Regions:
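Multi-pass alpha-helical transporter architecture, strongest
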Residues: 147-171
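C-terminal ends and interior cores of transmembrane alpha-helices
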Residues: 57-74
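Short amphipathic helix-loop junctions that connect adjacent transmembrane helices
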Residues: 4-21
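Intracellular juxtamembrane helix-capping segments at the cytosolic ends
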Residues: 91-106
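Helix-to-loop junctions at the C-terminal end of transmembrane segments
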Residues: 34-51, 136-137
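Hydrophobic core of transmembrane alpha-helices in multi-pass small-molecule transporters
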Residues: 76-93
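A membrane-interface helix-boundary motif in multi-pass transporters
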Residues: 134-152
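Loop-to-transmembrane helix entry/capping segments in MFS-fold secondary transporters
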Residues: 17-18, 107-117
Length: 171
């Protein structure tokens, strides 16, 4: 929900469409790609489970920086820092997630297995995006960002407790 509501927040605080396009479409997207590269270099030495926990924790922390503009800290350097931190860590977390999804795919039907896993993740993202505006209308930007952070933290705790490294091709 948080990433979906960040763009409307930027509109509401008065950024121009050009500023938003540059911030999210160019700079933050480059940060996302760099996050994927960094994660790709770190997954083997850290292992899959540790990578997913560390990168998801970093994403949770960076997501909470969305609260800065929600509380009125809206100067451009802060907005760039917030967007870049969030997109960098999303790139890291996504790379770890996709690596594990590939590990969990069987040799008999890897394309189908990966596609099903990816589709479930995409449907979850679409569902969260679909309700984010309604939730924001009810509890505001601050509430959405805090709730998203709480959900992300719970997810990290579940990953740490439930993730089974024995069933992955690499730990």
């Amino acid at each position: 929900m948080a990433p979906t509501m960040f763009r409307p927040l930027l509109v509401d605080i008065g950024l121009s469409l050009s500023d938003i396009g540059w911030l999210l479409g160019i700079v933050a997207t480059i940060a996302n790609m760099l996050g994927g590269i960094v994660a790709g270099l770190l997954i083997a030495p850290l292992g899959r489970k540790r990578s997913l926990i560390v990168f998801s924790s970093l994403w949770t922390l960076s997501m909470m920086t969305y609260l800065l503009p929600a509380f009125g800290v809206t100067n451009l350097p802060v907005l760039y820092l917030v967007a870049c931190a969030a997109f960098l860590t999303i790139g890291m977390m996504t790379t770890a997630t996709f690596t594990i999804m590939m590990d969990k795919s069987t040799l008999e039907s890897p394309g189908t297995d990966y596609t099903v896993q990816s589709s479930v993740g995409t449907m979850g993202s679409i569902g969260a995006a679909a309700i984010s505006g309604v939730v924001a209308g009810a509890i505001g930007y601050r509430g959405v960002f805090a709730l998203s952070g709480a959900i992300a933290l719970i997810s990290v705790i579940i990953i740490a407790k439930v993730f089974d490294t024995d069933k992955s091709s690499a730990t």
